[in-house]
């Protein structure tokens, strides 16, 4: 029985090979006695198969701008100029915030489809021609490759020397007219896009006339979706921010007369409907007051802050009271334990800033020192904490008494006057965060039933700190300590 079992498991020898007439050779599925072992076959991608997706230049731009660990000053951009060929400029020299159509002469801006490569400290990290991506690790047949964070954490062993592949036609700027459209279609799926800007593209009509077509805001470079402006968690120093997207306006009909100041540009469908009743668009523009209709335009999207000015909690009595409140929270809701703010990281955020690079950090420290030492700051000498407040089932915090609203507004105005980029959220007030649950998590904080000891819950206001926000899941980094006296 055992012999029959062994014989059933082992495949039978090819009888045609024994007779010397097996026409399959090495491809035969039956074993050939004495034949060399076949070499392992490496599967190659079939011709015409779809290549792995390569993250676009828009994704790289967004990553450089919004990742706190990346310094935009370390990057440079290689792009195709219509007349000069491929040029390379520092990343910070480009204007990434305004629509291309709104920029005037002398402002450096480039559409997304003209970008050829990115360099990080002189090394090529993203190249369209060679499908190199050391920012996200995309575009590799073998799967995810090394990323920019791997290189930052591990050193040079993750880097491979890559040379940018530049066609001869691009080196001299010859034959670029048709190249722009082809590259735009290849990367954007048929729709040329700019670098997150409202680009104006020229299209030829019949008869040789040229008309301008607005493509609208490029959705591929929108700010990462994070907490909205009404979320009070935005002032804890680590929360990402989001403002509503700017709405698109209807294209207006052309009005020949400009002498009447109250004439209003109406949507084309509305103007046509009015003209059918015997009135022209110009006449109806005078009848309809602009104030009748509500303004649908919303504020532009706020940039994500990278730094913040904060008051650190240093009093041991206040820290002990916060720990007691957190322990009470864990007893009634054990699932909230992982979302508690450590006692050594307790702080109140006063100002949110958007800074890029060590140079702006040093300038912000000097500007903050001047703003604090200037008279009229209205800073209270001591803060008291008693009541706990739940903000949207995601943030448990304690509000200070007296409030820091006046001091925060004064600092915002003074730092803006110094030329710093301040992220303003007027609906938010400085508060002490005890626990914070990220949005999208199923856990909800319960209603607070604990009150801090008013005698122990005190914090003198003598120093402010300039801090850099950490990555997701990491704490912030204090940079500069500035005394209020």
UniProtKB/Swiss-Prot annotation:
<dbReference type="Pfam" id="PF18044">
    <property type="entry name" value="zf-CCCH_4"/>
</dbReference>
<keyword id="KW-0863">Zinc-finger</keyword>
<feature type="zinc finger region" description="C3H1-type">
    <location>
        <begin position="8"/>
        <end position="35"/>
    </location>
</feature>
<protein>
    <recommendedName>
        <fullName>Leukocyte receptor cluster member 9</fullName>
    </recommendedName>
</protein>
<dbReference type="InterPro" id="IPR009097">
    <property type="entry name" value="Cyclic_Pdiesterase"/>
</dbReference>
<dbReference type="GO" id="GO:0008270">
    <property type="term" value="F:zinc ion binding"/>
</dbReference>
<dbReference type="InterPro" id="IPR042653">
    <property type="entry name" value="Leng9"/>
</dbReference>
<dbReference type="InterPro" id="IPR040459">
    <property type="entry name" value="MJ1316"/>
</dbReference>
<dbReference type="InterPro" id="IPR041367">
    <property type="entry name" value="Znf-CCCH_4"/>
</dbReference>
<dbReference type="Pfam" id="PF10469">
    <property type="entry name" value="AKAP7_NLS"/>
</dbReference>
<dbReference type="Pfam" id="PF04457">
    <property type="entry name" value="MJ1316"/>
</dbReference>
<dbReference type="InterPro" id="IPR019510">
    <property type="entry name" value="AKAP7-like_phosphoesterase"/>
</dbReference>
<keyword id="KW-0479">Metal-binding</keyword>
<dbReference type="InterPro" id="IPR000571">
    <property type="entry name" value="Znf_CCCH"/>
</dbReference>
<feature type="region of interest" description="Disordered">
    <location>
        <begin position="212"/>
        <end position="247"/>
    </location>
</feature>
<keyword id="KW-0862">Zinc</keyword>
């Amino acid at each position: 029985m055992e012999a029959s079992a062994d014989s059933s498991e082992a495949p039978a020898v090819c009888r045609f090979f024994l007779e010397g007439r097996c026409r399959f050779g090495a491809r035969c599925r039956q074993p050939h006695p004495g034949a060399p072992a076949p070499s392992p076959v490496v599967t190659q991608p079939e011709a015409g198969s779809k290549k792995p997706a390569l993250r676009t230049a828009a994704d790289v731009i967004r990553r450089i701008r919004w990742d706190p660990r990346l310094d935009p000053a370390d990057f440079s951009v290689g792009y195709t100029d219509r007349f000069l060929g491929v040029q390379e400029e520092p990343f910070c020299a480009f204007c990434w915030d305004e629509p291309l159509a709104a920029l005037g002469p002398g402002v450096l801006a480039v559409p997304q489809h003209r970008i050829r490569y990115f360099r990080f400290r002189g090394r090529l990290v993203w190249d369209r021609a060679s499908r190199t991506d050391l920012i996200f690790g995309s575009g590799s047949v073998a799967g995810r490759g090394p990323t920019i964070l791997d290189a930052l954490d591990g050193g040079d062993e993750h880097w491979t020397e890559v040379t940018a592949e530049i066609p001869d036609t691009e080196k001299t700027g010859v034959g670029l007219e048709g190249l722009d459209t082809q590259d735009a279609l290849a990367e954007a799926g048929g729709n040329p896009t700019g670098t997150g800007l409202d680009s104006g593209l020229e299209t030829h009509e019949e008869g040789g006339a040229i008309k301008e077509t607005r493509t609208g805001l490029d959705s591929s470079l929108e700010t990462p979706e994070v907490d909205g402006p009404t979320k009070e968690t935005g002032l804890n120093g680590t929360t990402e921010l989001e403002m509503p997207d700017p709405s698109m306006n209807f294209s207006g009909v052309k009005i020949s007369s400009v002498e009447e100041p109250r004439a209003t540009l109406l949507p084309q469908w509305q103007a046509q409907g009015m003209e059918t009743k015997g009135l022209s668009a110009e006449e109806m523009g005078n009848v309809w007051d602009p104030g009748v209709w509500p303004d649908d335009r919303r504020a532009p999207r706020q940039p994500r802050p990278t730094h913040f000015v904060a008051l650190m909690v240093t009093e041991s009595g206040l820290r002990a009271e916060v720990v007691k409140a957190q322990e009470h929270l864990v007893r009634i809701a054990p699932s909230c334990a992982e979302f508690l703010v450590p006692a050594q990281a307790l702080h109140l955020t006063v100002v949110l800033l958007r800074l890029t690079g060590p140079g702006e950090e040093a300038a912000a420290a000097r500007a903050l020192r001047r703003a604090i030492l200037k008279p009229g700051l209205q800073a209270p000498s001591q803060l008291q904490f008693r009541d706990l407040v739940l903000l949207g089932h995601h943030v448990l915090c304690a509000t200070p008494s007296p409030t820091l609203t006046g001091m925060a507004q004064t600092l915002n105005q003074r730092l803006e006057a110094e030329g710093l980029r301040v992220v303003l959220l007027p609906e938010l007030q400085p508060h002490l965060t005890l626990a914070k649950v990220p949005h999208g998590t199923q856990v909800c904080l319960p209603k607070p039933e604990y009150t801090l000891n008013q005698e122990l819950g005190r914090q003198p206001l003598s120093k402010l700190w300039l801090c850099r926000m950490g990555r997701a899941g990491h704490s912030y980094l204090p940079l500069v300590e500035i005394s209020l006296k």
